[in-house]
């Protein structure tokens, strides 16, 4: 009775161990992604071994120990320890086959895992040539290995494609940006130099315009003096006419005296004509001075020449005035002589009166011309002031352009630096992708 109960208990214990082993096998295969066919083969072998063992009657205790060892190894492998093995395979029949199958299964799982790890680790460093070696693998493990190898091959192709894209597409763009930044930096430097040169030129022109303004003021002063001289001439002519008028009642004494007075009057006319010519030339020179001042290019030099000519003409006018004064004095002398022969020069005095009136009219016309010259000189002064104001504006604009050029140069320098950094980053990234 006790023997029967003991056998029943051992048989019951074996019946409980077998499902446990089967569950652990299922867990191990789930962990490893194992084949369902292999799983059922192991289960079938296990059941046959157990049934055979029970049938034959063998040692239930030893069988229970072998199954316990198998369960322990399967538990370790299910926890991720693929180094676990059944070291002392003592079972025979179904139990022995189960133990050997477990060891072979773990050998395959470990070999596949190590190969997969080595291949993926190499790929992680860019060495895609490392593939999973399928020698010794069976069934689904071979399929899994081939799938991983194909994935590694595709990854290698994609990396190569990306590196080619980076070298052929991205890198040229980065280089183009860097070249453009360098060119922009050079252009901004040239622009800054040009702006600085423009500012210096504007300063030079401003100084020349200021000098031109001073020269125009000098011409204006000379014209005022010239106008005063004309007025003085007019006064002297009127005085001469008055003297001639006083001699109107004096008779002419001799023909010679009358001719002398007539000749003196003619010389006065010639001198007045000379004054008229000088005034015309002065007017022309004033016009040239206005044009030279408006050009603002070489205003200083051109205007200096014109001012010198005006000065010479003013000197000629002074000499003509002196000559006129001399001739008027001569007229006075002739008039004094005419007083002695008042009866003889009555008709001549009348002619002198008429001539004096003509001279006065000519002097008035000359005075009008002088006023016009003064007006033109004033306009020239205004134009010179406008040129000075414009040059100041140009100088300010050039200064702003210089500042802007400096800002562009700074931006271009920063862009160039960033382009260099980007180029280094792209090169480094390509290097990391190509040789990880």
Curated annotation (Swiss-Prot):
Assigned keywords, A-Z: Biomineralization, Cell inner membrane, Cell membrane, Membrane, Methylation, Transducer, Transmembrane, Transmembrane helix
Tagged with keyword Membrane: yes
Protein name: Methyl-accepting chemotaxis protein Amb0994
Gene Ontology terms: biological process: response to magnetism; signal transduction
Transmembrane residue ranges: 9-29, 31-51
Domain of life according to the entry: Bacteria
Family: Belongs to the methyl-accepting chemotaxis (MCP) protein family.
Subunit-structure text: Interacts with MamK at cell poles and septa.
Known function: Probable methyl-accepting taxis protein. May be the receptor that senses the torque generated from the interaction between the magnetosome dipole moment and the external magnetic field. Overproduction interferes with magnetotaxis, cells respond more slowly to changes in the magnetic field; requires the MamK-interacting C-terminus of the protein. The effect of magnetic sensing is to control flagellar rotation.
Region (Required for interaction with MamK and to respond to the magnetic field): 321-436
Residue numbers of Glutamate methyl ester (Gln) PTMs: 211
Annotated positions of the Glutamate methyl ester (Glu) modification: 225
Lineage: Bacteria, Pseudomonadati, Pseudomonadota, Alphaproteobacteria, Rhodospirillales
Protein location: Cell inner membrane
